[in-house]
Amino acid sequence: MSTGEAIPRVAVVVFILNGNSILLGRRRSSIGNSTFALPGGHLEFGESFEECAAREVMEETGLKIEKMKLLTVTNNVFKEAPTPSHYVSVSIRAVLVDPSQEPKNMEPEKCEGWDWYDWENLPKPLFWPLEKLFGSGFNPFTHGGGD
């Protein structure tokens, strides 16, 4: 790996809470293919974390979110990926503007589909950074207090 080419990037991932469930989609990607992951993506120049969260969720799922709160930041290095990469991932908690709204798969080339999963019964396999975060005892429902 040439570290001169691998520059860390900032990603924003979103824990959308709906009752006792979170929204997850099965990835179609060279990194973490077929694992379950949160909606999210790259922070664009000049964007706030909240703006990025709202934009990415809308682009990927068609959902409108609100009451966004910064939860945690993780450092994820994918040395074994076909193209090694390094992401600083900012985790945001949010809720739906309209709780009756259902997710749509707006980017089928990147995701097999979105669904709500009960916090006590999450699907496997989870995307490695998410598995690592949950393994540390992280809980998006209680971390950082209430809104």
From Swiss-Prot:
A GO cellular component annotation in the UniProt record: cytosol
N-acetylserine carried by residues: 2
InterPro entries in the record: Nudix_hydrolase, NUDIX_hydrolase-like_dom_sf, NUDIX_hydrolase_CS, NUDIX_hydrolase_dom
Knockout consequences: Increased level of 8-oxo-G in genomic DNA.
Alphabetically ordered keywords of this record: Acetylation, Cytoplasm, Hydrolase, Magnesium, Manganese, Metal-binding, NAD
Enzyme Commission code(s) on record: 3.6.1.55, 3.6.1.67, 3.6.1.22
UniProt-annotated location(s): Cytoplasm
Positions occupied by motif Nudix box: 41-62
Keyword rRNA-binding recorded: no
Residues that, per the record, bind Mg(2+): 56, 60
First-listed, main subcellular location of the protein, grouped into a coarse class: cytoplasm
Keyword Transcription: no
GO molecular function annotations of the record: 8-oxo-7,8-dihydrodeoxyguanosine triphosphate pyrophosphatase activity; 8-oxo-7,8-dihydroguanosine triphosphate pyrophosphatase activity; dihydroneopterin triphosphate pyrophosphohydrolase activity; metal ion binding; NAD+ diphosphatase activity; NADH pyrophosphatase activity
Gene Ontology biological process: DNA damage response
Misc. comment: Has the ability to complement a mutation of mutT in E.coli and thereby completely suppress the increased frequency of spontaneous mutations.
Function of the protein: Mediates the hydrolysis of some nucleoside diphosphate derivatives. Its substrate specificity is unclear. In vitro, it can use NTP, dNTP, 8-oxo-GTP, 8-oxo-dGTP, dGTP, dATP, dTTP or dihydroneopterin triphosphate (DHNTP) as substrate. Has some NADH pyrophosphatase activity in vitro; however, such activity may not be relevant in vivo due to the high concentration of manganese used during the experiments. Plays an important role in protection against oxidative DNA and RNA damage by removing oxidatively damaged form of guanine.
Protein's name in the database: Nudix hydrolase 1
Gene source species: Arabidopsis thaliana (Mouse-ear cress)
Gene from which the chain derives: NUDT1
